[in-house]
A protein has these predicted regions:
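N-terminal membrane-anchoring alpha-helices
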Residues: 1-35, 195-202, 209
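A structural signal for short, hydrophobic/glycine-enriched beta-strand patches
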Residues: 18-174, 178
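Proline-rich intrinsically disordered, low-complexity coils
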Residues: 28, 57, 181, 191-193, ...
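Electropositive, surface-exposed helix/loop patches at the edges of structured domains
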Residues: 115-121, 141-149, 191-211
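A transmembrane-helix-recognition feature enriched in membrane-embedded lipid enzymes
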Residues: 170-195
Length: 211
């Protein structure tokens, strides 16, 4: 009984601590210029449908990524998501949507092995050599993404993709409660993701990341 109580307190403490810490680096779009220029904007992937269309959360992320880019906070965008199968590709869907908005493919880098939040942040630093980043995802997800990024040594900030109207999904919110404690261990021990590859510096040629 005591053990269960202690675990519950730790569980709640980890969640609250990560939320408070992560949110201290979250900015509204209108104030993001306060952080100065960033190496890149990281747009994190989410589900795409069989017909290639974006899920609502992914559409929010891409649209906020576009707005951030056009605000001038960074000259580079890194779209990071799951492209583990030939018939499932979050990354090129995001890239195509950004191109349709008028952003040149020459400034859009693609990370095809961003299978989870940790992999995306690790690869942003180690493969794309970013140092200062602005992360775009939903508000519930930002604290964990920022926490992981900063534990890995990135100077990371965030803008909520849903700042104009919060995205809420009960299943997703509950899953996030359990994901935060799990990623504490990744942040501490810093495991190497399965997929590595050659360095593609974010200040170089975006076409080198195409796939």
């Amino acid at each position: 009984m005591i053990t269960a109580s202690v675990l519950f307190v730790v569980f709640i403490g980890v969640n609250l601590g990560m939320i408070i810490y992560g949110n201290s680096y979250v900015y509204p779009l209108s104030d993001i210029s306060e952080i100065g220029d960033a190496d890149c904007i990281i747009v994190l992937g989410a589900a795409v449908y069989d017909d290639g269309s974006m899920s609502y959360p992914l559409r929010q992320r891409v649209e906020m990524g576009e707005r951030l880019y056009k605000s001038g906070i960074s000259e580079r965008i890194l779209v990071s998501g799951d492209h583990s199968r030939e018939n499932y590709d979050e990354v090129n869907v995001m890239k195509a949507a950004l191109e349709d908005s008028g952003i040149s493919s020459q400034v859009i880098f693609t990370d095809h092995a961003g299978f989870d939040t940790y992999d995306s942040m690790y690869r942003a630093k180690e493969i794309f050599k970013a140092k200062k980043v602005v992360i775009v995802t939903q508000r519930f997800h930002l604290p964990r993404a920022i926490f992981i990024a900063r534990c890995l040594g990135l100077d990371a900030y965030g803008v909520a993709a849903d700042e104009d109207g919060r995205y809420f999904n009960l299943k997703t919110e509950v899953r996030e409660l359990f994901a935060r404690p799990k990623y504490i261990f990744d942040a501490i021990f810093k495991p190497t993701p399965k997929f590595q590859g050659e360095a593609i510096p974010i200040w170089g040629e975006a076409s080198l990341s195409d796939g």
